[in-house]
């Protein structure tokens, strides 16, 4: 029966009205489902349209569109500073810019004023003026030469710090401009040439890689002490082309040090090799056995490795030969016994040498970093919720509710770090379960994501047991940004020496900044210049709090 007019509805019997209402409800449900499909199709079309726009920008050589804006969780959960009007009123206004009280005056110049007759003398108005004398200094070294009775020639040595016709001051300036100032070799040559220095690009490159062994030893010492004594190691990685091939740079850092390591892979094997340092050591011990059991390696393989006559190997070749002798290289099963056993042996060597000490590894949930005592970044976890694309208002509201609950919980974790207690830790664990264990939000993708984050409970709540570790990897991303800037300006590296120089010098520059040291003074101290002496950086990295 048609439902065209209100008059016809009045003549309907109750059963007919019920049938009509049921048909209308079915029609509304059909239209609602169709609307959801259209909304989902519209969202998909928008994504495809944006992908096409990005591809057009790439083909035109234009810069890519900026990434998704951050949700603002970090700033929104910061505790506001207490208002102290009386203290603010008592504080005198400051002039902008760095203070001049730390400067030492090299000379004093008295300026006279053309005062007319009858003027009264009122003393001096003192103004500090800074200037710099940037000019080349050319020195002719006349080296004595002596012919010994046995036919040899003895020549006087050049002063320490002279490299290829360039003095230590020029060497320090080139290193500072390139690694801290992020200037290319061509621009350094242009600046120095304009100032009157006769220098070529080849000489600049030679200065950048000179005395690399000195800085490499200090970088290794900083890395060894930093990952063990800092209490935590925040890690991240990024792409870095080397010798025309795609490579990856891994960042290691804390609030006291930074180190970079570049290699052809970002697998867990590569990460463990970096943690182990420059030594190639494989050890089958209790830590390695626990690793293999956690990876679900076959018990027969584990028993064969544990019962072998040799349990430590000093090179990759020896370890590979041992795996082949046990027949593991011929197995085609999952998980791969060669890969898992190699990871376990490297982890066993790290544990045997106590490379990490009591440090926690903090990461963005990338799989290669999931080793040892591990913590996860809350900003990356919340970002997964922030990046969901809702198809209707119901899904949008579900996302907003989940985000607000995560924000409140993140703020509570910040407060916990200031005053940790076992009682509050249990309360926060219960709150975590209520937020991430719940279901039925009305948005399937959100429900799956919350369950995934709940499975990461141990890593996300590591801060309850170790309140000294950060809640995010923002510091790692800041360190990585230095390398990304260098990559955008200079491109990739060609030689292994150039790659190592970049990693070492950028890491030392960031370490000096975190230790509140002048990288310029540090270079002067290491190059033998009369600058403030700076002790070994590894000794300045404070031990982890007990």
Q: Where do the model's predicted regions map?
A:
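Catalytic center-proximal scaffold of phosphoryl-transfer enzymes
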Residues: 29, 141-147, 152-546
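Short, flexible loop/hinge motifs at secondary-structure junctions
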Residues: 1-165, 205, 235, 282-341, ...
């Amino acid at each position: 029966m048609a439902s065209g007019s209100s008059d016809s509805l009045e003549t309907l019997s109750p059963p007919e009205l019920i049938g009509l209402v049921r048909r209308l409800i079915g029609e509304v449900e059909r239209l609602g489902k169709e609307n959801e499909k259209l909304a989902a199709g519209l969202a998909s079309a928008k994504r495809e349209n944006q992908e096409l726009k990005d591809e057009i920008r790439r083909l035109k050589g234009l810069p890519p569109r900026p990434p998704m804006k951050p949700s603002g969780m970090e700033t929104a959960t910061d505790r506001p500073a207490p208002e102290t009007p009386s203290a603010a009123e008592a504080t005198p206004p400051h002039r902008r810019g760095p203070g001049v009280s730390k400067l030492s005056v090299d000379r004093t110049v008295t300026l006279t004023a053309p005062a007319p007759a009858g003027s009264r003398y009122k003393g001096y108005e003192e103004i500090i003026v800074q200037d710099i004398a940037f000019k080349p200094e050319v020195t002719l070294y006349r080296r004595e030469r002596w012919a010994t009775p046995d036919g040899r020639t003895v020549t006087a040595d050049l002063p320490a710090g002279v490299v290829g016709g360039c003095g230590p001051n020029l060497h320090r300036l080139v290193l500072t401009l390139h690694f801290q100032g992020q200037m290319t070799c061509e621009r350094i040559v242009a600046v120095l040439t304009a100032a009157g220095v006769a220098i070529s690009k080849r000489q600049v490159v030679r200065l950048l890689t000179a005395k690399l062994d000195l800085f490499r030893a200090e970088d290794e010492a900083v890395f060894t002490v930093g990952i063990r004594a800092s209490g935590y190691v925040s890690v991240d990685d990024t792409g870095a082309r080397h010798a025309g091939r795609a490579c990856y740079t891994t960042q290691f850092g804390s609030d006291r040090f930074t180190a970079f390591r570049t290699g052809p892979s970002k697998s867990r094997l590569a990460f463990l090799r970096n943690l182990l340092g420059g030594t190639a050591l494989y050890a089958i011990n209790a830590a390695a056995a626990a690793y293999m059991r956690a990876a679900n390696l076959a018990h027969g393989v584990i028993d064969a490795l544990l019962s072998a006559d040799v349990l430590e190997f000093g090179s990759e070749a020896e370890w590979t030969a041992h795996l082949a002798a046990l027949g593991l290289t011929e197995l085609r099963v999952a998980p791969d016994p060669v890969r898992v056993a190699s990871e376990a042996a490297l982890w066993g060597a790290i544990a045997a040498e106590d490379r990490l000490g009591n440090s926690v590894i903090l990461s963005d949930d990338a799989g290669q970093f999931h080793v040892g005592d591990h913590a996860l970044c809350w900003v990356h976890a919340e970002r997964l919720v922030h990046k969901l694309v809702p198809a209707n208002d119901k899904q949008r509201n579900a996302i907003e509710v989940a985000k607000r609950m995560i924000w409140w919980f993140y703020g509570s974790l910040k407060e916990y770090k200031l005053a940790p207690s076992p009682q509050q830790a249990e309360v926060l664990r219960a709150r975590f379960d209520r937020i991430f264990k719940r279901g039925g939000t009305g948005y399937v993708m959100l429900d799956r994501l919350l369950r995934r984050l709940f499975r990461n409970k141990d890593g996300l709540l590591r801060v309850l047991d170790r309140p000294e570790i950060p809640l995010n990897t923002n510091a790692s991303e800041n360190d990585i940004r230095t390398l990304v800037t260098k990559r955008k300006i200079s491109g990739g590296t060609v030689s292994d020496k150039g790659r190592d120089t970049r990693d070492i010098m950028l890491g030392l520059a960031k370490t000096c900044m975190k230790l509140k040291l002048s990288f310029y003074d540090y270079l002067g101290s290491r190059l033998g210049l009369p600058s403030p002496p700076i002790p070994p950086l590894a000794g300045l990295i404070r031990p982890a709090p007990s």
